[in-house]
Regions:
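Nucleotide-activated sugar donor-binding and catalytic core shared by glycosyltransferases
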Residues: 1-180
Length: 180
């Protein structure tokens, strides 16, 4: 079953490239696409725009939105102070997630995805919307999960890993081989 609204999480560096590779294989049924990324992440925004411009050449009525949220944790920020910035990011994310009411969240990588996924879980707890959360752990994670992965392993509907060692350690995960 394909739903009308899809939400994609985008991240800096290689995470953006990984998620865009996944999206390149999706049909036009996954439209509109709502990208959510850190408000300070200009590089991902540029990559998304380029990706969507190329996609529009194939799918003429391709629709997408760009949405920014506060970053949970800046590089070199202390773990103790990141609790407050993460809570702020969750509070900021909930109205956005409520407005979009996505059917699916496809996410990978750094902590920016955690507030959006928590917001989606709140929608379900409040009986407003069941959002399917698909987390794809980065290809770079060979033996251990990222912090986001360790958190979302318990809350995602589908948790995909790209290395057999991770499947052995995390039995709920789905191993599909290298998918990005």
């Amino acid at each position: 079953m394909l739903a009308r609204h899809r939400t994609k999480r985008i991240y800096r560096r290689g995470h953006t490239t990984e998620i865009l590779r996944l999206l390149s294989s999706l049909s036009q049924s996954y439209s509109p696409r709502h990208y959510i990324f850190a408000d300070s992440d200009k590089m991902s925004e540029d990559k998304i725009r380029t990706f969507e411009q190329k996609r529009a050449e194939t799918f003429s009525n391709s629709q997408f939105t760009l949405n920014r949220i506060p970053r949970c944790r800046e590089v070199c920020q202390s773990w103790s102070s990141s609790v407050l910035t993460t809570l702020y990011s969750i509070l900021y994310s909930f109205p956005l997630t409520f407005r979009l009411k996505p059917d699916l969240i496809l996410c990978n990588g750094p902590g920016t995805c955690v507030p959006v996924c928590i917001s989606a879980l709140l929608l379900e707890i409040l009986a407003l919307k069941k959002v399917i959360i698909v987390y794809v752990e980065s290809i770079c994670r060979v033996e251990t999960l990222s912090l986001s992965g360790k958190i979302l392993y318990y809350f995602s509907d589908y948790f995909i890993v790209q290395w057999p060692a991770l499947k052995e350690k995390y039995p709920k995960s789905i191993y599909l081989g290298r998918i990005v």
